[in-house]
Amino acid sequence: MILPDWAGYRRFRPQLAEAMDPAFYPIDHLDALILSGRARLWVGEHAAIVAEIRDYPGGARAVHGLVAAGRIEEINAQLIPLAEAWGRALGCTHAIIESRSGWMRALKPYGYAPHRVALRKELRP
């Protein structure tokens, strides 16, 4: 198991928490994923990303971007390629990022294209 850069994580933890929807993914959940080794953290000078490996019933294996914070240029040019290389080394055939719609535009030059659309409705009593 690779030990996480906990000091780097703590530096970006507030921004990562802000980027996540706490109703679905509270920051404590991300803490647990990183500490357990189920998710991997990459920290740069001005940005950080977290990803995990997901295996799908049809046999596909993907490196799945969970959350990112900081300067988008550093995320796109430096950190995402590190996560992709990690995924390739672990047998991943895909990289998937499920996030806000602005990421579609930001990641298009890096070969990312829309895959699915998630629709959400709040169910009230």
Question: Model-derived features: where do they sit?
Answer:
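Conserved donor-binding loop and adjoining core beta-sheet/short helix segment
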Residues: 35-74
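Active-site/acyl-donor-binding loops of N-acyltransferases
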Residues: 97-101, 105-125
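Short glycine/proline-enriched coil/turn segments at helix->beta-strand junctions
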Residues: 44-47, 91, 113-115
